Design a protein with these regions (language model features):
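PLP-dependent aminotransferase-like
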Residues: 1-66, 73
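Active-site nucleotide-sugar/metal-binding loop of Leloir-type enzymes
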Residues: 28-30, 78-82
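Active-site region of PLP-dependent enzymes
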Residues: 69-75, 82-134
Length: 134
């Protein structure tokens, strides 16, 4: 986050769940806020409905850290369907691991296209540059 010139603002947790406390999110939002980045801690899903309501109210993206939430569902749906994106880690300390690595689950084609370019050093194919000076 810092590397990209952004400044994280931390929001306290709900002591009962260990997850971000939705009641405290709005107080942390400023005109510079662009996203809410909650973590599903130890397989306990965040209150995705309330977080999305807050994000919609302020026009913010929601990017979940779902590294602990493989297979976790809320109302019969995977937590990976919540928000604009979910991130997964395959580090050795996670439930499913490859020693290192991860995955992104996105819900819109434009974001996926941009991420695909970034992961391939800005190339769309063998010769087409899409992001100059990456």
């Amino acid at each position: 986050i810092w590397w990209n010139g952004c400044k994280p603002v931390f929001v306290d947790i709900d002591p009962a769940t260990g997850n971000i406390d939705p009641d405290k999110i709005e107080a942390a939002i400023t005109p510079r806020t662009t996203a809410i980045m909650p973590v599903h801690v130890y397989g306990k899903p965040c209150d995705t409905k309330r977080i999305q309501e807050i994000a919609d109210k302020y026009g913010l993206k929601v990017i979940y850290d779902a590294a602990h939430a493989f297979g976790v569902e809320v109302n019969g749906e995977s937590v990976l369907t919540a928000g604009d994106m979910s991130t997964l880690s395959f580090h050795a300390t996670k439930v499913y691991n490859t020693l290192e690595g991860g995955a992104l689950v996105m819900h819109d084609a434009e974001t996926k296209k941009r991420v695909d370019y970034l992961k391939n050093f800005g190339f769309a194919g063998e010769t087409e540059d899409t992001i100059i000076f990456l």
